[in-house]
Regions:
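Intrinsically disordered, low-structural-confidence terminal and linker regions
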Residues: 1-46
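Weak global preference for isoleucine
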Residues: 2, 13, 17, 70, ...
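Glycine- and aromatic-rich loop/turn segments at beta-sheet edges
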Residues: 30-58, 74-111, 142-173, 207-237, ...
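An alpha-helical repeat/solenoid feature that recognizes helix-turn-helix modules
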Residues: 48-78, 105-133, 155-201, 231-258, ...
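Alpha-helical scaffold repeats of the Armadillo/HEAT/TPR superfamily
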Residues: 138-144, 202
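Glycine-rich, flexible loop segments associated with nucleotide phosphate handling
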Residues: 201-207
């Protein structure tokens, strides 16, 4: 049985996150509302274009970056230019598929480094990656270094929103998801070997160091992974279903590998099922 006190509800944590942003800036809501309203209108246009059969890959990247800036940061001066890019991109419904950029990513329509990870890892798993010309993954070359990887993850582990104006959940989750795929998916490991022009190697040391960090990050009481927050009354770790699903899914990946505390993962999932 999982101790209910360990299971912070999504509504409660969202309220506390909002309060932390307001503690930092009393005008937070006044800044957030008009930007979010503009984003909602542009998102409706994007959804309409996609429903009409247009892929809109570049627009989607702009939209996701704007969503992150508005909901996970208070960097308001950065939001307007990204919304402008989104609005302009929506005028072209026949956008070409995104190809690998000069930095090695498939994130041509992203500015933030970590936002390039997801589209790149996805593209590397498409059939074209096995045959088309490829460039070095220079933008993520640092992810081959175990010390850099662990240091970056550790800096993302706890968000102190009142001090920094940044909720690091999205970046931490993106990093964990990308690394779990890069390191644990046989398909990607084989691709890095068969396509040496990518200039990316997953070393045994990287796998060992990352795996050890992953198990240390797991809450042994619940079996879950999730972001942590520094509030005035102490730190709170969220038992996050999305984090946990991706870690379990990519680690196992048809390999038969065993997740530590899997019985706790099941018990916690059953305990929070009404919150999902």
């Amino acid at each position: 049985v999982i101790d209910p006190s360990l299971l912070t509800t999504r509504r409660t944590i969202l309220e506390r996150i909002g309060d932390a942003f307001r503690q930092r800036d009393k005008d937070y809501d006044a800044q957030w509302k008009p930007l979010n309203k503009r984003l909602e209108g542009l998102m409706k246009e994007l959804e309409d274009q996609q429903s009409a059969g247009h892929a809109m890959e570049c627009s989607t990247q702009h939209a996701l970056e704007a969503t992150w800036l508005i909901n996970y940061t208070d960097e308001w001066p950065r939001v307007g230019p990204v919304l402008d890019e989104l609005e302009l991109s929506l005028k072209n419904p026949d956008q070409p598929r995104l190809v690998q950029d000069s930095d090695g990513s498939w994130g041509l329509c992203c500015h933030e480094w970590y936002r390039k990870l997801e589209p790149t890892v996805d593209a590397l798993q498409e059939k074209e990656a096995a045959t088309e010309p490829l460039w070095p993954l220079s933008f993520m070359a640092s992810l081959q270094d175990p010390a850099i990887v662990i240091d970056r993850l550790e800096r993302l582990r706890i968000s102190d929103i009142a001090a920094t104006g940044l909720n690091q959940r999205d970046e931490q989750g993106a990093m964990l998801t990308a690394l779990c795929q890069i390191i644990f998916k046989d398909r990607l490991r084989k691709l890095f070997v068969s396509r040496p022009q990518l200039q990316f190697t997953v070393s045994q040391q990287l796998e060992e160091k990352f795996t050890k960090y992953l198990w240390n990050l797991q809450d042994a009481r619940t079996g879950y992974w999730g972001p942590a927050y520094k509030f005035d009354d102490g730190d709170v770790t969220v038992q996050d279903l999305s984090y946990t699903f991706h870690v379990v899914h990519y680690f196992v990946d048809g390999s038969g590998r065993k997740i530590p505390n899997m019985d706790k993962v099941v018990a916690t999932t059953l305990a929070i099922k009404d919150q999902v």
